């Protein structure tokens, strides 16, 4: 789901083109790996607050944040394997501290992808690969 954030640099006139591209990538990638359920790419742009509200029913809510130095996926203490996970990955400039605090109010946990700051295009791939290696298809 594309989000409007304080540091987002995507031009609004490009959003439709990007969403169509992401949908095509999701479909082609699913076919390639034999995945039956194609990941959903939302049509419109949501605010962070709306995304957080819409994630209430998820078993686990994560924000991958470059400033989180101590907490990684392997450090999470879970009672059971999650069946559904809401994932937030920041824009090119990262999330602001105020945005991180807002996500925490909605029950999101901050986790690190490691010591390197990843490109906005790369971070989702790394995050999803790590989640899948821990818990399989979600």
Descriptions of predicted regions:
Residues 32, 88-92, 110-112:
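Short glycine/serine/threonine-biased micro-segments
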Residues 1-62:
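RNA substrate-binding interface of SAM-dependent RNA methyltransferases
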Residues 68, 92-93, 115-118:
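Short, acidic/turn-prone active-site loops that include or flank metal/cofactor-
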Residues 97-138:
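Structured adenosyl-cofactor binding patch, chiefly the S-adenosyl-L-methionine
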Residues 44-45, 64-67, 91-92:
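Fold-independent oxyanion-binding glycine-rich loops
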Residues 67-81:
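Strongly charged, low-complexity linkers/loops
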Residues 82-102:
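A C-terminal functional module that forms or caps the active site or interfaces directly
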Residues 39-40, 59-63, 83-87, 109:
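Structural motif
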